Amino acid sequence: MAADDDNGDGTSLFDVFSASPLKNNDEGSLDIYAGLDSAVSDSASKSCVPSRNCLDLYEEILTEEGTAKEATYNDLQVEYGKCQLQMKELMKKFKEIQTQNFSLINENQSLKKNISALIKTARVEINRKDEEISNLHQRLSEFPHFRNNHKTARTFDTVKTKDLKSRSPHLDDCSKTDHRAKSDVSKDVHHSTSLPNLEKEGKPHSDKRSTSHLPTSVEKHCTNGVWSRSHYQVGEGSSNEDSRRGRKDIRHSQFNRGTERVRKDLSTGCGDGEPRILEASQRLQGHPEKYGKGEPKTESKSSKFKSNSDSDYKGERINSSWEKETPGERSHSRVDSQSDKKLERQSERSQNINRKEVKSQDKEERKVDQKPKSVVKDQDHWRRSERASLPHSKNEITFSHNSSKYHLEERRGWEDCKRDKSVNSHSFQDGRCPSSLSNSRTHKNIDSKEVDAMHQWENTPLKAERHRTEDKRKREQESKEENRHIRNEKRVPTEHLQKTNKETKKTTTDLKKQNEPKTDKGEVLDNGVSEGADNKELAMKAESGPNETKNKDLKLSFMKKLNLTLSPAKKQPVSQDNQHKITDIPKSSGVCDSESSMQVKTVAYVPSISEHILGEAAVSEHTMGETKSTLLEPKVALLAVTEPRIGISETNKEDENSLLVRSVDNTMHCEEPICGTETSFPSPMEIQQTESLFPSTGMKQTINNGRAAAPVVMDVLQTDVSQNFGLELDTKRNDNSDYCGISEGMEMKVALSTTVSETTESILQPSIEEADILPIMLSEDNNPKFEPSVIVTPLVESKSCHLEPCLPKETLDSSLQQTELMDHRMATGETNSVYHDDDNSVLSIDLNHLRPIPEAISPLNSPVRPVAKVLRNESPPQVPVYNNSHKDVFLPNSAHSTSKSQSDLNKENQKPIYKSDKCTEADTCKNSPLDELEEGEIRSDSETSKPQESFEKNSKRRVSADVRKSKTIPRRGKSTVCLDKDSRKTHVRIHQTNNKWNKRPDKSSRSSKTEKKDKVMSTSSLEKIVPIIAVPSSEQEIMHMLRMIRKHVRKNYMKFKAKFSLIQFHRIIESAILSFTSLIKHLNLHKISKSVTTLQKNLCDIIESKLKQVKKNGIVDRLFEQQLPDMKKKLWKFVDDQLDYLFAKLKKILVCDSKSFGRDSDEGKLEKTSKQNAQYSNSQKRSVDNSNRELLKEKLSKSEDPVHYKSLVGCKKSEENYQDQNNSSINTVKHDIKKNFNICFDNIKNSQSEERSLEVHCPSTPKSEKNEGSSIEDAQTSQHATLKPERSFEILTEQQASSLTFNLVSDAQMGEIFKSLLQGSDLLDSSVNCTEKSEWELKTPEKQLLETLKCESIPACTTEELVSGVASPCPKMISDDNWSLLSSEKGPSLSSGLSLPVHPDVLDESCMFEVSTNLPLSKDNVCSVEKSKPCVSSILLEDLAVSLTVPSPLKSDGHLSFLKPDMSSSSTPEEVISAHFSEDALLEEEDASEQDIHLALESDNSSSKSSCSSSWTSRSVAPGFQYHPNLPMHAVIMEKSNDHFIVKIRRATPSTSSGLKQSMMPDELLTSLPRHGKEADEGPEKEYISCQNTVFKSVEELENSNKNVDGSKSTHEEQSSMIQTQVPDIYEFLKDASDKMGHSDEVADECFKLHQVWETKVPESIEELPSMEEISHSVGEHLPNTYVDLTKDPVTETKNLGEFIEVTVLHIDQLGCSGGNLNQSAQILDNSLQADTVGAFIDLTQDASSEAKSEGNHPALAVEDLGCGVIQVDEDNCKEEKAQVANRPLKCIVEETYIDLTTESPSSCEVKKDELKSEPGSNCDNSELPGTLHNSHKKRRNISDLNHPHKKQRKETDLTNKEKTKKPTQDSCENTEAHQKKASKKKAPPVTKDPSSLKATPGIKDSSAALATSTSLSAKNVIKKKGEIIILWTRNDDREILLECQKRGPSFKTFAYLAAKLDKNPNQVSERFQQLMKLFEKSKCR
């Protein structure tokens, strides 16, 4: 019927219906016939109208048909209606999906915009480089004509020879001659580079080269122009320089594409200047660019230079494409091209050598001109062919080329910078340029030559095979001819080479001199170090590179960001080519490519050069290139070189650093290609390369296979080079620590350390006997550097697997050594695991190459992503942490030394740190390959060097036990080992290094253990879940196994579908109970406890009872009843929290038990463990436990040292466990930061000693001993974080550490990370521990337990531990975990650099509440702690501006999930949390408006710059509040997008609040918070007012800084926590202050006045404010400003509360504040405060309230702060909330205050004042307040938003609106409550709202407090997507929403009305309301 209807029966149907139905109707009432007529007529269409009789029947039929049709039609209509409804529903869904799609599209587009910006940048770079290349090609194409015009070339040669003659006699004339040559060249070569030439001419080569090396330029000129040797070298050196300069210039060109030509001209000019005499020929060789355009010689040189630079660029490009080729292809093509190139280079070298002789120079110049012409032609053809053949990959190539060039340039630039410091000793890879300038240029040229040649040869198969046939044939013919000449020349040069060898020896000194004098000495250096000089020049090039490179770095860093997948391969191409050449043609590769003609001589020469600087870098390349022939020599030379290097180390340090960086970078870049290359020279590089290449390990393997012949040489070189690199690394580390800023230093260190550590480690590995020594050196020196090596470690891990297969061909030992070295690097690198993990994953972002990266740490840069993968291995994160701790000892070795050091440590568990470092270095290095083979577990390779094997065996067993814990975290294990600076820590290392062993030995030991009880799983089944350590020696091992089971349980749970039954859940929990209890029962705990059965029973009972509670639980039942879509996630979150709590409880029991047990004989047990191999793992555990107990005992006896050790041990254990879980990433972050600190501080040992002094405040201790601090942090973290880190913080933390992460992180992770960031924990450190903070901030009773336990549950341990500042494991577990985790994160990173006792308050805002008992002690220590802390904290304090690009789960609301109140509140007091949240809000609001983030494309230079160690160190020394890291540091959310946050962690202000102030903070803050807060606000701006007013001053300072930045958030949080902790003291202090004032009321009044005064002083700027009411309002608003102005007085005032009050009174008088209003508000506040004051705070609150009353609005805040005990940092907000606190629960108010303060202290202050005034009945102030608020807000915003007028305006508007709303809010408590909710939810924007609402409605206090808390949690005021403000919510908006919803109810009409009013989408409004309500509810829950 439907078909009929549709088909047109529709009409007939309707006809029927119109006719037949009518008849049906008629039939009933009419005659059939009567109807029949009509029926016949109507239905005539259907019925033929037969006979009438028939018609009757027909009519019936018709009616039946009609009715049937009607029925079917009706049915169809019903169906149609249903379908319509369905359509409507679907359309609704569609629209919803469309809206979602739209939002997603918007997000995507914002992402695309960012990415496109990056891509555009990359394309611009690519285009620029293409243009450069095309220009070079044009020149080259021009050069062929010039080549043909040999007359012209010869003419130029004659000119050049004339120049040479004139210049050779005069070094000084070199520059002149260079200029002449330049002018000549510019005339001849003017081409398009006339401007660049002019520039070059204008800038003599010295100038140009003087970028990094002025002397070098002169030296090079002199060297090249004057000396035959220099000429000789200059041939190469010039080309190298040219290529290097070309690259430098490329960097320049990156900035200035015109500079490209300038660069070319620079290189040409430089080449001209250097070898002016030689340059005719050399330029033809090395600087074709320079001469190519003007004259034949220029032509040939410029053509060659073009070919060099072109091949450099193109070579790089080709290199990238070549890298893309299979290694075999590369090796073959490389071999072919290299063989050709060898000839060429040999001829060139011989020519260069001959050129050294002016006579031979001219000839050779012509020859070289001819040859370079042919070469250039070949290269041109080759490049053209390459371009032609690789056009598709051209962008890629260009990109990789850019990146490689960028990396090279980066390296070179960085090296150049170092070279500026010490240019001489760097003969980088090519080491051909005699003078450093020529080196840099020659390096470029040689690099380009070699790379080009390599590319030509490598790409020759691609393009070269096409054009190569022609070009190569020509080139080969020419090269053969040249080679003949060269050979003839070589015969002469052989002498030269011998001379060169001798001279190279001289060159070491000469090079130094040359680099330093860079003039006359270049002569000898040139001859002797033609290659060495080239290397130097390369290094110089690298050095000069940084100038351009850093410029280029931005783009390249962006490129790298874009290149995230480009991976070092593309960055590596140039160096890779060199190294590949080295590998494939050991002689021709590396330096040999350029020196191939000199190969034979180079063999002899290389050794000598190797001995010299070449030995450092050139040897690496020379030996690499000539590894086979000169392998032994270079090895000896390298060994010799290491010594000279040490001599040269100062200069070499930088030079070598640059060289190393370059070579390492090259290796890193070449890591894929060098894989094989590593076989010969690059073994160190190989490690690096393999690491960076790790993803391309297959390639590496192929390369290795292709270069199987080279392995021996590579091993030798590996050892030598590694050693050299190690030395270089040592120097470089020093340089890094000194030279690099924190971010820059960190990144550079990461890059350098990684590469260096790799090289050093590979060196160490090959020369294992030396490895112990070198590793120690490296470990000590490298450790600071080896932060970066963290990255390497993960790479090594994966690499080791591949390397083993490939490297074993060479030498299993060497490969193992390499791997171990890599492991070392990994261990060290793991510190920077973030970075090098990125290298691993984001190989394209070679931090080594990204030397300038410090500028940009952004999601774009996210090197971390790849790291995340490695991090997943879990080893890198922990290693870095521990590496930090053991930076000196283990960093390089940590991964490798883990097993070794573990064995050593196990043997001497407490004292083998150094020994184990050495041993573990070598041992770990050996073990690392196998260990790293398995990502989850570090297999300590018995294959590792045999000397280490014994250790490893011992450590294996130990590790077997430990590994089970750290098994999943081999890197962590290593880091643990590193952590085990104390012998105890070593066991962790060992156990993790021996993860694989653990699996095996552990299995045996496990199997030895049989089931003990009936209700237990079989050991075999258990072992399937977890490697059982039958006789665990430490609580950590037990916890590790438990965590493994927990992971297994989670794994099983996650196998469930989204919906599953309660029975299934019960089964999972039951299986978990069985697994846990079975494990406990299987374990032999005799090493941990005396009463094993009792302990087991207790543990099993706790597990069963807790898990049964989890099984049968109302929450679980409700979750199953609700069957929410995310039930599974929520349920597991609940289970996870419970398990966290359970684990913490178990750990407490184990720790306490092991403490008592461990006191017996830690040393003896440790010794036993070291003695007993079988018992090693157990012994180690025991020794760890013993050391823990011992530490605890010591701690008890000497609270400091014992605490330190205990906490270290406990931390180590917990770290170990936590590492095993996911702490590794957190630790890595911490350690990265710590390493930075350490690098800056290099106070590990000092910090250790200091650490003991700090041990009482062990969490603080982290600063003193990064290792121990890290251990403590880790322990704390691991205890709680071990539980929670499992969740997923590991990745995030590590990502945070790396600052760049695109790794997917869970919302919880993101939230944790960000929460920690926003909460002000040391953002990087706390990124680790902050997450951990959240992690250990157990949402479960643990928080309370922690608080109670720290004092009561674990009186002995906890009290001591609390006293020790969470030093002991127990307190760590309990209270320490809560605050000490944060503190350890914060404190350790801060204090790690400083070895001073860190006050818990100082250490950790989160742990502040825990420190209350320790406050008295802490107070005393606070000053010292703060003093010691400043350096460490300075990193963050100092505008560390670490741009953390945290992948944010926030999609629109993500911040809600990401700022989970439960997470942050779990461990920290609500007040602290509110402080965090308020800081968060401030961050968010100010961030959105003030801190307009400039996308990370340009990474935050300020952050990297300000994070320079020197900068933040000096800053940390800032007077007064050295504890600033927490207070002043704030994470400024530079960019908030759905994907990520770019958080800049910067110091809020150099707030000077000192420890005294902090200690005073609780009471003083509470009572005098208004005063001190304002003072503090003023203080920071005017001066750091005395530290005595620490908290409030610092709070205000923070507020100022918050206003300026969002740093005050952390400050607020910290201060809040501190306030809580310090409340008694502060209370007393406040009482004292109040007494000083006469009485608390007077004090309060005076404080109020003071606040007013402060405000008034702010009004001083805002004198327009007529009345004191206005002033008081404005004071609150202006507090930021006020405290600025008042700071003069406040400094005094902060010193003396009485003085402060007096000053305040004076200010009040000056302001002429309306005393009545102030008094009224004060009274009101006083009443409310007194009534609402909380607990002990009540007294303080009363005092504070009176003070606050005297302050006016602030008194309420003061009361609130007092009541909260967390006087939250923002004075204004605190005051606001204090006033509100009087009316409402202080905590709520405090939270609100935080939010308000965070958002806008001025606004909140204004609001508060408004509310206060309105409360007192001064409503007139409300009307005035808006203006005042605007003024103060303006001021505050002006302070913070000077650069953000829009934000100011918006905030002003918000303030006005808020003020307007405030009156209504005051009118209705509900409204105020809504405002409070709004404010709290808005965190930043609603600040004003919250205070007003709070004040207006005491009842709302809770909600407002909750809102405040939730504000920090979620409601984003500014929703940005990729930097674009999509939605902007102001406090006024929130207030309107809340008020309207209160009045009208949350209906759609209300939302529509609000949407119209607010100009928003109703959906947005409703969403915002929901967010605010969520926040409000969350805050309520809190």
Curated annotation (Swiss-Prot):
Lineage: superkingdom: Eukaryota
Coiled coil: none
Region (Disordered): 159-552, 569-593, 875-1017, 1157-1188, 1251-1283, 1803-1909
A Pfam entry, by short name: Myb_DNA-binding_7
Stretches the record annotates as NCOA2-binding: 1709-1982
Motif stretch (SUMO interaction motif 2 (SIM)): 1737-1741
Annotated Basic and acidic residues bias: 159-191, 198-210, 286-395, 406-423, 444-455, 463-524, 905-924, 936-965, 999-1016, 1157-1170, 1851-1865
Keywords recorded for this protein, A-Z: Acetylation, Activator, Apoptosis, Cell cycle, Cytoplasm, Mitochondrion, Nucleus, Phosphoprotein, Repressor, Transcription, Transcription regulation
Modified residues (Phosphoserine): 20, 194, 567, 658, 815, 875, 940, 1161
Motif (SUMO interaction motif 1 (SIM)): 1683-1687
Main location: cytoplasm
PANTHER family the record matches: CASP8-ASSOCIATED PROTEIN 2, CASPASE 8 ASSOCIATED PROTEIN 2
Name of the protein this chain belongs to: CASP8-associated protein 2
